[in-house]
Amino acid sequence: MKNFLRKSIAAQSYSKMFSQGTSFKSLNLSLEAPSGARSSFRSLEHLDKVSRHYISEIIQKVHPLSSDERHLLSIIINSNFNFRHQSNSNLSNIILNIKSFDKIQSENIQTHKNTYSEDIKEISNHDFVFFGVEISNHQEKLPLNKTHHTVDFGANAYIIDHDSPYGYMTLTDHFDNAIPPVFYHEHQSFFLDNFKEVVDEVSRYVHGNQGKTDVPIFNTKDMRLGIGLHLIDFIRKSKDQGFREFCYNKNIDPVSLDRIINFVFQLEYHIPRMLSTDNFKKIKLRDISLEDAIKASNYEEINNKVTDKKMAHQALAYSLGNKKADIALYLLSKFNFTKQDVAEMEKMKNNRYCNLYDVEYLLSKDGANYKVLEYFINNGLVDVNKKFQKANSGDTMLDNAMKSKDSKMIDFFIKKWSGIRQTI
């Protein structure tokens, strides 16, 4: 029953991706949207078909293989893979739970997002959980990498050593399939110190036969074969003899193999909807800043850092600046904020939000939360008719609401203004 449920959820995620992503339509790899609320398993069959298409495409490019190439391919196919998800959120206790952006939205969870409108429009893979991929037999050395596509996605690394029967692999970030220049790579010094030509060859788009928007996709069963064949294709084209010899070393170790693969590519693995497992490793890579903890709704880190009113001022300013209503309301309930506290917040020199903006501006800017605004005004923490002194000097909160066409805020301010006039 559990396996059937996983398969059904995966089918929904793939149906959404293949039917709604405009990129698949342009590549003639799309799938019609299901007629009912539930997706059939047809979308999983479609994934297998797409994977076979890309395997066939790369086989035609590299066939036949030399003995060195066959040996390298065999090493990759038999390698242990580890999957790394980085976040500033606290995603685990005894169980690791990682949810897709679509799942988070459906549950009205407020947290920092790494999925953007272009991703959703073009590939619609926002119902998947994303992982970097590492090749290593040495659990004690993990993680081997701390960034993905030059980006540090968080201070906590959550590592699993098991794949999903319904996952899919891309050789790069699925949306941004450009491999960056060597100077942006995490382990650049290894390649700059040891090789010459390949450091200039690595920056490129990784794509199929239909141009740079044609991003190869492999199901879990095919992913090692796809990685190996594409790596062989890159090695063949390289003019760097030293790099070629390094890759074809019969005794190459897993860490060196990982260095090669995550230099030539930036592997990304995707699991449908949600990962929930007790088989994982959590590694803290660095400290989490207060602002990052707030953006990630990491209450444990926030409570560790916000131990007095002075730090609460900082935290509240970060919450307002990042439109984190959940954290702002949490802090307001935990600490007894007064109008004097707000005045002290605005004088803080080490908080960019208070340096640039009045608190009233942050409360009423486009996308600000109505409940937070209501709390501040109803508890007398700010004056409804105060004119801004920093950004948009001379304007009021009503002006901000008018610019963003926030009818709920506009009505609230008008009622408050009317009440003020009646008392004069």
Swiss-Prot record:
Belongs to the OspC family. This is Arginine ADP-riboxanase OspC4. ADP-riboxanase effector that mediates arginine ADP-riboxanation of host caspase CASP4/CASP11, thereby inhibiting pyroptosis. InterPro entries: OspC1-4 (IPR010366). Its EC number is 4.3.99.-. NAD(+) binds at residues 85-87, 91, 104, 114, 130, 148, 153, 173, 268. Keywords: ANK repeat, Host cytoplasm, Lyase, NAD, Plasmid, Repeat, Secreted, Toxin, Virulence. The keyword Oxidoreductase does not apply. The keyword Kinase does not apply. It comes from Shigella flexneri.
